[in-house]
């Protein structure tokens, strides 16, 4: 029995880290999808002090490693704990409301190990509906740049979190996810890794990422707060050595591209709120869009229309 157990530990190559908080109902599906995503893997569930039935749910599932945090520290803290707990060379990340597709990790492992200079591999995600995680038909991103992607990534975070498989050593050397970031901590990590490493990509769906809406109780459902936190992450990346050593015109370009993207996201949210009759939400998003791109005519026009409307 001991020989069998030791051999099992040796051949495992991938740890799938699943941070969770009060998602006992969704967690079993995430765990099952992780198990089917590849061979030679372990599943580590990091419970960020859930107050629901999460401990009992995990106790009833055989073959997983369950780690309960002493205090609720957020996603970055939980993911770092999972990485530290990992006994494998490679680490994949999966949120408790997302799903991995069968066999996806084996394909990504092949791409990741093709070059020692590669820090992580990502792929496309099918966007799932907020309630049942069923694919909506939308795929993100449409294209998956690879190689040296630092400057492309500085414009926008196009890497779906549940699609990433990384070398544990690079995550540790980067000092893990930044616990001071309550949102967009993944983009910050990918930027730090891509600054001086190559990135591999599998341009096919490898995960199902649940669409974020306010009703789904997801941290990433507030578009305005996401954009504000993302701006902070980009500003942090722009003072890192590689960005600082580049031409100022290049830095200005990626800043403009990001602000344009934030503006588009917020104006889309505002338009959706208008159609749903949520006047105050629409007004708030337009004001935030105006802050990112104050000289865009469309934002100015809608802003003043809303301010004058009774």
Regions found by a protein language model. Name each.
Residues 25-28, 52-60, 99, 103:
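Acidic helix N-cap motif at the loop->helix transition within catalytic regions
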Residues 32-41:
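Short, acidic, metal-binding catalytic loop of nucleotide-sugar glycosyltransferases
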Residues 33, 47-56, 71, 95:
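A conserved acidic beta->alpha catalytic loop
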Residues 69-86, 96, 107, 148:
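Glycine-rich, basic loop-to-helix element that forms the pyrophosphate-binding segment
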Residues 84, 141-230:
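Conserved nucleotide-sugar donor-binding catalytic segment
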Residues 91:
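Short aromatic/hydrophobic "clamp" motif used to bind/position activated sugar donors
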Residues 152, 205-213, 219-246, 275, ...:
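Catalytic core of nucleotide-sugar-dependent glycosyltransferases
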């Amino acid at each position: 029995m001991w020989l069998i157990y030791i051999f099992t530990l040796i051949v495992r190559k991938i740890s799938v880290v699943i941070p969770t908080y009060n998602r006992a109902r969704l967690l079993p599906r995430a765990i099952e999808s992780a198990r089917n995503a590849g061979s030679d893997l372990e599943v580590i569930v990091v419970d960020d002090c859930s107050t629901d039935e999460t401990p009992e749910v995990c106790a009833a599932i055989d073959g997983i490693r369950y780690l309960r945090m002493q205090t609720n520290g957020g996603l970055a803290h939980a993911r770092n704990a999972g990485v530290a707990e990992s006994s494998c060379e490679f680490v994949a990340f999966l949120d408790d409301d997302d799903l991995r597709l069968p066999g996806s990790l084996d394909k990504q492992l092949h791409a990741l190990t093709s070059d020692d200079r590669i820090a992580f591999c990502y792929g496309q995600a099918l966007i799932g509906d907020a309630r049942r995680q069923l694919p909506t038909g939308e795929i993100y991103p449409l294209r998956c740049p690879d190689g040296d992607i630092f400057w492309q990534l500085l414009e926008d975070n196009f890497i779906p979190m549940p699609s990433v498989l990384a070398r544990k050593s690079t995550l540790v050397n980067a000092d893990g996810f930044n616990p001071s970031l309550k949102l967009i901590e993944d983009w910050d990590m990918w930027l730090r890794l891509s600054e001086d490493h190559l990135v591999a990509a599998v341009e096919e769906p490898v995960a199902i990422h649940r669409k974020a809406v306010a009703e789904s109780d997801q941290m990433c459902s507030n578009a305005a707060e996401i954009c504000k936190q993302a701006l902070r992450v980009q500003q942090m990346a722009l003072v890192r050595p590689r960005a600082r050593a580049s031409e100022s015109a290049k830095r200005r370009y990626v800043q403009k591209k990001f602000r344009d993207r934030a503006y588009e996201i917020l104006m889309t949210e505002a338009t959706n709120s208008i159609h749903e009759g949520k006047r105050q939400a629409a007004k708030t998003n337009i004001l935030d869009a105006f802050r990112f791109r104050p000289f865009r005519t469309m934002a100015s026009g809608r802003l003043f229309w809303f301010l004058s409307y009774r």
